[in-house]
Amino acid sequence: MKSKERIILQRLNRAFLTNPLIESNYEYNRFDAENKNYIVEIKSRNNKYDQTIIEFDKFSYNLLYAKENNKFFVYAVKMNDKIYIFNITKLKEFNYNFNWEWREMPKYTEFNNTKNIRKLVGYINIEDATKVY
C-alpha cells in the first residue's frame, strides 16, 4: 500500500473505532484492507470527478472474495479532501449500471510506465456514495 492510501486508511479508521480496518500484508492483494465485515479497495485521485472508475478485475475478484468470506466489498476513493465510500456489494445487489467498457489505460498506475493496455472498466457516480468523509 502506498503512503497516500495509508493516510486514507487512518482517516477511515476514525469511523471504524470498534472494528478497525487492518492493512493487507500481501503486497499484490487486490484489496488494501479488511476487518470482520468489510474488504476495502482504496484509491486516491488528484482531481475530483463526477464519476470514479473501477477496474473489472478488482470488481469481480473482490466481490467473490467478499461473498466467500461473508463480507461487504467497499471501494473508498479520495478526491480532493473528501473520501467517497461505495458499497460495491450493495450496488451489485441493486443491479447498479456500471456502464462497463474497454478503455486504453496505463498498465501500471504507480509507476512511470507509459505503456497502455486495454482494461475493462466501470463507472460509479459520486452521488451514489454510501458515505462521504
Write out the residue ranges for each language-model feature.
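Acidic-basic catalytic patches of nuclease active cores, encompassing PD-(D/E)XK
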Residues: 1-25
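Catalytic cores of nucleic-acid endonucleases
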Residues: 7, 20, 44-91
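Non-catalytic C-terminal interaction segments of nucleic acid-processing enzymes
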Residues: 11, 21, 25, 78-133
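Short glycine/proline-enriched coil/turn segments at helix->beta-strand junctions
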Residues: 17-18, 35-38, 69-71
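Beta-rich catalytic cores
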Residues: 29
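Conserved catalytic cores of phosphodiester-cleaving nucleases, focusing on short active-site segments
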Residues: 33-48
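General helical secondary-structure elements
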Residues: 39-41, 54, 114
